[in-house]
Amino acid sequence: MAEEHSNQRSQTFNGERTNRPSRKPRGDGERRGRRQGGRRRVDYLAVNHIDYVDYKDTELLQRFIADNGKILPRRITGTSSKNQRKIATAIKRARIMALLPFVANN
């Protein structure tokens, strides 16, 4: 016969059954790590009508690079996917031409 358990899964440990839940139950209403509201980021290139991102314009490109030298993601910069590709291409070209560093200067 099958044993019935109330909302708990039984685990086998060294051949003995335990009646503790196997994991924390989900859906208990807790939400962690979610931002409430906040200011919406705007696309800097679209607002300033910048059509071409020049790899030699390091002052502009520095806005989209983190302190450690990584390219910032769209969710942080607020750029569109099209403009994010333009920025990434320009940053990579500037790195090859030694105008921007690949990593931070620690």
Swiss-Prot record:
Any one annotated GO CC term: cytosolic small ribosomal subunit
Gene3D superfamilies per UniProt: Ribosomal protein S18
Protein name: Small ribosomal subunit protein bS18
Record lineage: Bacteria, Bacillati, Bacillota, Bacilli, Lactobacillales
Region (Disordered): 1-41
Record flagged with keyword Ribosomal protein: yes
Stretches of the chain forming a coiled coil according to its record: none
Family: Belongs to the bacterial ribosomal protein bS18 family.
Alphabetical GO biological process terms: translation
Alphabetically ordered keywords of this record: Ribonucleoprotein, Ribosomal protein, RNA-binding, rRNA-binding
NCBIfam families: S18
GO molecular function terms attached to this record: small ribosomal subunit rRNA binding; structural constituent of ribosome
Name of the gene encoding the protein in the UniProt record: rpsR
HAMAP family: Ribosomal_bS18
